[in-house]
Structure formats: C-alpha cells, structure tokens
Amino acid sequence: MPVKMVAVLGASTVLWILFAVSQAFKIEISPEYKTIAQIGDSMALTCSTTGCESPLFSWRTQIDSPLNAKVRTEGSKSVLTMEPVSFENEHSYLCTATCGSGKLERSIHVDIYSFPKDPEIQFSGPLEVGKPVTVKCLAPDIYPVYRLEIDLFKGDQLMNRQEFSSEEMTKSLETKSLEVTFTPVIEDIGKALVCRAKLHIDQIDSTLKERETVKELQVYISPRNTTISVHPSTRLQEGGAVTMTCSSEGLPAPEIFWGRKLDNEVLQLLSGNATLTLIAMRMEDSGVYVCEGVNLIGRDKAEVELVVQEKPFIVDISPGSQVAAQVGDSVVLTCAAIGCDSPSFSWRTQTDSPLNGVVRNEGAKSTLVLSSVGFEDEHSYLCAVTCLQRTLEKRTQVEVYSFPEDPVIKMSGPLVHGRPVTVNCTVPNVYPFDHLEIELLKGETTLMKKYFLEEMGIKSLETKILETTFIPTIEDTGKSLVCLARLHSGEMESEPKQRQSVQPLYVNVAPKETTIWVSPSPILEEGSPVNLTCSSDGIPAPKILWSRQLNNGELQPLSENTTLTFMSTKRDDSGIYVCEGINEAGISRKSVELIIQVSPKDIQLTVFPSKSVKEGDTVIISCTCGNVPETWIILKKKAKTGDMVLKSVDGSYTIRQAQLQDAGIYECESKTEVGSQLRSLTLDVKGKEHNKDYFSPELLALYCASSLVIPAIGMIVYFARKANMKGSYSLVEAQKSKV
C-alpha cells in the first residue's frame, strides 16, 4: 500500500475514535450534590443524560424510603418534583439512567428548613411610663430549631439575645420566643423595638436567612396633675356667669369630662369639653363640680365648689368716679341700678348749681348728657337711685381741660455748627395750665424742662412757651428735637395727657478747608493748558464759585464748576484767581496766583551815536525787549579768546572814549524762564587822522578790511532778518553759511 494511503487511513481512524469518545454516555443532576428547600415550598430535581437517544430513568432514596414526589420523564431528561416539601423529603436522592448495557447514577442530598414568617412582637400590656412591661418576640414554625438565634433591640440598644443551639433535634415545626422585661421612660417615645430572628443555614439566601419585625414604641402616661381654673371667682352673684377650665397631663392627651356631684354622690355629666361655662346662675347652681381627665390607661380628677349668692342692690356710675372732659366735647354720665327691677333716678351737682345737661331715664339706667362742655360744667355730680324703701347715691367728678393741639417748635435761624441758636416750644390753648409741664429734648438729652405749677389757676385758655438756647454740633445731625407737653390731671388719670412734636436736626457746617490744586503748575508758558480745581468741606456740600480778582480788588465771577480750565493760556490770563465755597452757613475763600510766562520777542539792539565811531567818542549800546517786562538782558562782546559779559544797566552799556580795541561784534541775549532770543551788531572804531598825504599801513589794512566788511554786513542783515522770523540769530552760523 502506498505511504500516502496509509497516512490517510490512519488519520481517519483517529478522527473516528475522537468522535466516538465525544459522544460517550454521560449523566448530570441539578442542583448538584446538595440543595435545601423550605417546608411547604415546591422543589424540582432534574436528571439529564447525553450520548443516549432513549435512556431509561429511575429515582429512589438512598435508604429506599418512599419518594413522596412525582416523576416526569421526557426524552433525555427526568424531573422529580416535591410539592409541597415536607419532612419526608429530607433524603439523599439517586437518579439512575440506563442506555443499552450502560448504567449511570448520580445522587443529591435534600435538606429542609422552615422559616416562613417574620417574628411577632407581643406586650404584656400597654407601655406606661414608670411601670414594668414584658415584651415577647416570637419566631413561629421554625425548623431546625437548633440553628435559630433571636435578638431584641430597643433603638440601637441590644436588650437580649438567645441562641437555641442546645435544643434537641426533632422533626417538627416549633415556635420559639425571647422575653424581656423593661420599664418604659418618656424618652422611649418614637424609638423602634426590633425583633430579629436568624436561621444559620449556609445554603439559604441571605434575604431568607434573617427576618425582623419593627414596632414603634407608643409610651403612655396615665392622667395626672388635673387642675381647674375658675373665672371670675368661685363665689358668684345671682345672675352672673362663670367659666371653668380644666387641664390634665397625660399621654395620649386625656379627654376632659365635666360633671356635678348630686346629693347621692352620683356624678351628673355636664360636658365633654375642657371649658365649662355657666350663665345666668341661680342659687341652686351652687355645688361641687368635678373635672375628670381620662385616657387609655387611667383617669384623674379634680373638684371645685361654686357658691352662688343672692344678687344685691348696687348703684354704678360710668365712665367712672372721675371724668376728664375737653372743652367743647360732649360728656355722657350713665347711672345704673343693679339688683332692682324698677328704680327711680335723680341728678344734682354737689353745690346745687344748674345741671346744664339733659337727663334721660330708661329702665334700670339714667343718662346725663352735657353738650359742648365749658368751664361752668366743672362739678361733682350725684346720681340718687331709689329702690323700694332704699336709696343709694353715687358721685362722679367732671374735670374740664383743654389740650387740643400738638406743641409747635420754632428756631431763631438755621442750625450751624458752633453757632448758638434759640429754640422755643409753644403749647397753645391750655387749661388748666398750672398742671402743664413742657420738656425740650435733643435726642435723649433734656435741654430744658419747666412746670407751670406756680402760675395762678384762672379759668381761661392760655398759650405757654418754653425757650432755650443751645450750640449745635455736627454730631446733632440725625438726632431729633422733641417738644413734649404733659397735662397732669391729678388723681383723675394714672398717666398724664401727652402731646409732642418732633423736628429732625440737620446741622449745617460752614465751608472750610477750601483747597486749590493747579495742574500742571501755577507758572506756565503762554499757550499751555491749565486746570484749576477747587474743593471745600461743609454741610451741605458747598457750592463752588470761581472769580478773578481785578486791580481794584473786586471779584469778577467766572465759573460755578469745581474745575476752571484754560485750554490755551495768554499773557493776559496772569493774575489772582479766587475760589469760594458757599453754603447756607457761610463762605470759605482761597486764592492762587497764575503766572503766564512769554518767550522774549521784538528784541532791539541799538548803538548810539552810530555803528561807526571815531576813537575817543562816547558810545552807548542798548538792548531792549518790548513784549516781556520781566526778562534778563545780557550784553556780551565776542572775542576769539572767549565772550566777555559787559556790565550793563537796564540793558545799556556805555563806552567812554572809545578805543580801537572796542571795535568788534556785540551780542545781546534776552532771557526768560521759558526761552531766549539773540541780537548782534558790529561796532567800528576809527583811528584819529594826522596827515592827509600819509597813507599808513594800518589805514591800508583798514581799507582792505572795510572792503570785506560791507558784503559781510549785508549777509548779517540777511541772516538777522531770517533769524527774526525764526525767533533767534547766531552770527557764527551766519558766517559759516557765508563761507
């Protein structure tokens, strides 16, 4: 056989063997090895095979007990269903699968347990503060009991724990309990009582392994401290009314019940409200009244005795024993008879003066109306009431007063810091003014107080004034000036009649610390801008006024802005500028001098008598600057060895008896703070003539020089004019240009 054919057959054989192995007969069971089921639930065990198309299945227990289950086989799968699970199902189950001559087995152990319900909490009675109570935690229908643990918590506190591991193993459902006795306190209200049961079996799902019951504690307090309040009194007049209020402490809040004790000690129920009101009382309503507080766990009661007395005959007059009446008002005096059905009334004054009023009688009342009360109505009035054979009198005093308006505050002028001011408080149309008191306050400080007790009490309306002087300060701003008028009425009223006026204080402060800022400087070059800024302190804020001081001392107003601005200054703007801070309290003034400096212009350099003089002549060289009076004039004589500054007086320099060496170039420099300007001229000094026919070498040299000077002078004049146009001139520059 060829080698290739052998290789192919060998490979085919190997593949067939591998395929046969992969299709081998196998058995599986689920759940694997071990499982657990709760009594009463349904449990299914599944046995399945692979590698066999039509296996045969059989189920049995390891000890050949009855299955207590149903078997359902379908194809390569067989299901053993226990429904419901019971103690008889706690076995090792074997599944046998047969395929031809092959036979396979798998076993699984089934454990059972019972933990069907949450634990129960039971109390021996209601939870009453201070009284012991037993709480029981029940775990019903437990199996196996020896794996049970019960915990009892109050809030976060563990009260007790019990493990039942020492219990004997019996195949039955048992109910186990844990008991704890404790004394409730008020702080237990709202806490949770937790009964927690745990069954320590590993295979149980964590949610089934532990069960708990939570019960919020409701703590009770039996009724106590039951009290009764009675208004107006326990002793009452016939026809009167009484209100009795009962309160009782407890938890839950006690219900209130009112009753009355009868002669046989039986309680007659009257009301289920906390308040019991009795009206139009009669003498037979006297007796003992009982209030009882009742809640779920107890009751508590309190008693009060009411005594109803026979109604007496009483006379009452209103508004009272003393009445204050303002002049012009109306007064109504009412006299009432209490305890008499048909009284008769009469009115009179204590001095038997005319009544000046209208009397009206109606039933048990009589009124005296005094219209538009005047001084003549100031009396004691008596009301006499006759009932059967008995007569009673009641007196009232009518006192007349006048106090119609609030006081008026006036000041002698505006309030200025540090300046005395007089203030007066006027109270108009007062009576009786000998009972008047006026007080003047600044803030909480009394400036002055006066009683008018020493003045004669005459029956007339008068106006009274309190006057004082004080010095305001800035600290008074925001305070109030209060004029307080009190009219004391003796015993007529507990408090005097009072009126007041309030005036807020606003203290002015005269302008001060007026300050001027000049930017950039008070000394400026003509054409420069400048800002003059002024500030002044005061209350109210001062108004700023800028003025310029004229030569005669008068002020010329310029602006009311804080800043005075010159965009381009001129020489005429130089002068004294005045800033005034002005408000109602005064004026503060500050001044500054503005100096506008001008560059030198129109400089003139002259020589007298001429630019060409003879030896021995007197020569005056003068330099003036027409546009700027305050300028420095410097005269110099130019020389190769250096310029020589000449001692000039007011810009003039005098050469007496001129010499040949005085000839040369003279320069004038005009200087100010902001600039300078130059001018120059040439002085020619000629020697004295001795012989007309003699032509000395010196004269020859002078002649030659003069022939050069004339063109030079022309050039100097040209450049001088050009320099005047620019504002400066340099002879040296001119000569350089010439060369």
UniProtKB/Swiss-Prot annotation:
Disulfide bonds join C47-C95, C52-C99, C137-C195, C246-C291, C335-C383, C534-C579. Expressed on inflamed vascular endothelium, as well as on macrophage-like and dendritic cell types in both normal and inflamed tissue. Expressed in the bone marrow. Pfam families: C2-set (PF05790), I-set (PF07679), Ig_3 (PF13927). Residues 721-739 are cytoplasmic. The chain crosses the membrane at residues 699-720. Residues 25-698 are extracellular. SUPFAM superfamilies: Immunoglobulin. Cleaved by the metalloproteinase ADAM17 to generate the soluble form. Sialoglycoprotein. Residues 1-24 form the signal peptide. CDD domains: IgC2_VCAM-1, IgI_VCAM-1. Glycans are attached at N225, N273, N424, N531, N561. InterPro entries: ICAM_VCAM, ICAM_VCAM_N, Ig-like_dom, Ig-like_dom_sf, Ig-like_fold, Ig_C2-set, Ig_I-set, Ig_sub. The keyword Repressor does not apply. GO terms for biological process: cell adhesion; cellular response to glucose stimulus; chorio-allantoic fusion; embryonic placenta morphogenesis; heart development; heterophilic cell-cell adhesion via plasma membrane cell adhesion molecules; leukocyte cell-cell adhesion; visceral serous pericardium development. GO terms for molecular function: integrin binding. Residues 25-111, 119-212, 223-309, 312-393, 408-506, 511-595, 600-682 form the Ig-like C2-type domain. GO terms for cellular component: apical plasma membrane; cell periphery; extracellular region. It comes from the Eukaryota. Keywords: Cell adhesion, Cell membrane, Disulfide bond, Glycoprotein, Host-virus interaction, Immunoglobulin domain, Membrane, Repeat, Secreted, Signal, Transmembrane, Transmembrane helix, Ubl conjugation. (Microbial infection) Interacts with ECMV-D capsid proteins and acts as a receptor for this virus. Cell adhesion glycoprotein predominantly expressed on the surface of endothelial cells that plays an important role in immune surveillance and inflammation. Acts as a major regulator of leukocyte adhesion to the endothelium through interaction with different types of integrins. During inflammatory responses, binds ligands on the surface of activated endothelial cells to initiate the activation of calcium channels and the plasma membrane-associated small GTPase RAC1 leading to leukocyte transendothelial migration. This is Vascular cell adhesion protein 1. The gene is Vcam1.
